[in-house]
Amino acid sequence: MAELKGNKYGTHRVIEPKGVLTQAAWKVDNDMSKVYSNEIVCDVTSLNIDSASFTQISDACGGDEKKIGEMILGIVAERGKQQNPVTGSGGMFKGVVAHIGEDLKKKPGFDLKEGDKIVSLVSLSMTPLKIEKILSIHKDIDRVDIVGKAILFESALYAKMPEDMSEPLALAALDVAGAPAQARKLPKEGDSVLILGANGKVVGVVRNPKQVPGLLELGVYTDVIVADCTKPVEVMEAALAANDGKEYDLSICCVNIESCEMSAILPVHDDGLVYFFSMATSFTKAALGAEGIGKDVTMIIGNGYTKNHAQITLDVLRENPKLRKLFDEKYC
């Protein structure tokens, strides 16, 4: 019997409320026994939980791995997807293509086949997911190894696993592929750039002093300062001191905790750019905060997709051996 064709954006999987896309839905259909002709079914081996989401879950569970696993299983059982009800964010998965719908196989330019190893480039917050079993939880890198299945829709983005790097390395890089691809569009030659959450001049801000030597060794930072990004005055004073008292042209905030918006805005001069690439970012805090201090800055919310973002991100690792080594040591 021929497979039924679903909506290219996956709205046929929305259970409630009707009329929304899968990301905005409270609950989606994760029944893997019925597959549509324009869907891809994947055997999932790992989930990379969004950093803000994993931090919130871990804090709520007191860091207890068993409770973290139970909470993740509970979210997926209730909602049909891994979407943190507090942060609204998800993550992405690594897996193997198990089934491709009839219509997708006929689609011009379609480049997948059963057995291909892939990384999803769309959020788990919109991806139907079924978890059979949690195998292990890696709290230090926000990763959960599982036995499970996921559905990718016709419109979904994905990347084949590269052959020249390990799977954990590729997964870690592709998890935030939109950030480097977009960030490279923003600075101009001679700009002063402030990066918050760094885990002309490029200054990184971290909370842990132990991270400073490794970051400086990369050769991409002019300076790395130690400050708490939830304390904007502290960050501003340290950041300006590192830049000879001058305000910055661009700041990039990739911190995975709340209330860091003003630390990104305060050190930037009028007409400067502030780029938020964190699911912990609050539009209200950023907009009203900038208004309250009279800062005329352009604020950009990071989009997880930019054309060729997966290739750009992997090439960054290929071209920077020190950065690749840092990723290898942390994620592999």
Listing of model-derived features with the role each one plays in the protein:
Residues 33-48, 59-124:
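Glycine-rich beta-strand-centered segment in the early N-terminal region that forms part
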Residues 245, 315-332:
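C-terminal capping/lid region of NAD(P)-dependent oxidoreductase domains
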Residues 183-189, 244-245, 266-267:
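Glycine-rich helix-loop-beta junction characteristic of Rossmann-like nucleotide cofactor-binding loops
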Residues 91, 118-192:
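NAD(P)H dinucleotide-binding glycine-rich loop of Rossmann-like/cofactor-binding domains
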Residues 200-259:
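Adenosine-nucleotide cofactor-binding segment
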Residues 255-320:
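Glycine-rich phosphate-binding loop and adjacent beta-alpha segment
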Residues 101, 122-124, 128, 197, ...:
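Conserved "cap/hinge" positions at secondary-structure junctions
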Residues 165-225:
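Mid-domain Rossmann-like dinucleotide-binding core that forms the NAD(H)/NADP(H) cofactor-binding site
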